[in-house]
A protein has these predicted regions:
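Conserved activation segment of eukaryotic-like protein kinases, specifically the C-terminal portion
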Residues: 176-190
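AlphaC helix of the protein kinase catalytic domain
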Residues: 102-112
């Protein structure tokens, strides 16, 4: 059920329209006081898995993005909490990327040429290198064709890593890793044993590159019931 109606307000942001219902959040396009378009995610805190929060109760997706600044990572704008119908919700405001996901691209074009794959992959690797070499390294955990957007607002498309819902700090316990809802076709073997690392992200990028080149992931048998 859509929680925010058109023209309703969240802090300094006015809702323009509902975008989609995700596994853990709803997303909207909003405008700030200056009239700039932004992307807002709304989280029902009571429905999020406990592994989505740090030891102080802060939502990890917000904590990680707030301190991440890189041209190949979606830009953090603001965050906070609101009450809707006596329930606490967290919101995260991000830049609104004018473009499409790699999944959208494949739906239209079926596959991508090798030069574009090489150039886009270099940019994504730069973003991952930034995350993996932070003082407190971060693992994204969900690099897929759905979670890379091409920013088409300039002369040259710029790939940007989005959706940090499964991102974790590398030094966290494996007990904080919850792979429920992840696409198993992109997961490294160790992830099925609840171990995640920077190498897991590189593996997922390799699967993404294969998918872009051939139009299918390297394996696509029915493993959705694997536990």
């Amino acid at each position: 059920m859509q929680l925010l109606e058109k023209n309703s307000r969240v802090k300094d942001y006015t809702v323009q329209f509902f975008i989609k219902q995700g596994i853990n959040a709803q997303s909207y396009r909003v405008k700030n006081k200056e009239g700039k378009n932004l992307f807002l995610k709304l989280f029902n805190c009571s429905k999020l898995h406990r592994t989505s929060f740090d030891e102080n109760g802060e939502l990890l997706e917000i904590k990680i993005l707030r301190t991440s600044k890189h041209p190949n990572i979606v830009k953090y704008i603001d965050s906070g909490e609101i009450i809707i119908e006596q329930q606490k919700f967290a919101f995260l405001t991000l830049e609104f990327i004018t473009g499409e996901t790699l999944s959208d691209f494949l739906t239209r074009e079926k596959h991508m040429n090798s030069y574009e794959i090489k150039e886009y992959s270099k940019s994504i690797l730069n973003g991952l290198k930034y995350l993996h070499t932070l003082p407190d390294p971060v693992v994204h955990n969900e690099i897929t064709i759905q979670n890379i957007m091409l920013d088409l607002s300039g002369n040259v498309p710029i790939p940007k890593i989005i959706d940090f819902g499964y991102a974790r700090f590398f030094n966290q316990s494996s007990k904080t890793y919850n792979r429920e809802g992840l696409n198993p076709h992109y997961l490294a073997n160790e992830c099925f044993n609840n171990f995640f690392s920077p190498q897991s992200d590189i593996f997922s990028l390799g699967v993404t590159m294969f998918h872009l080149l051939y139009g299918l992931p390297p394996w696509f048998s029915e493993i959705s019931n694997y536990r």
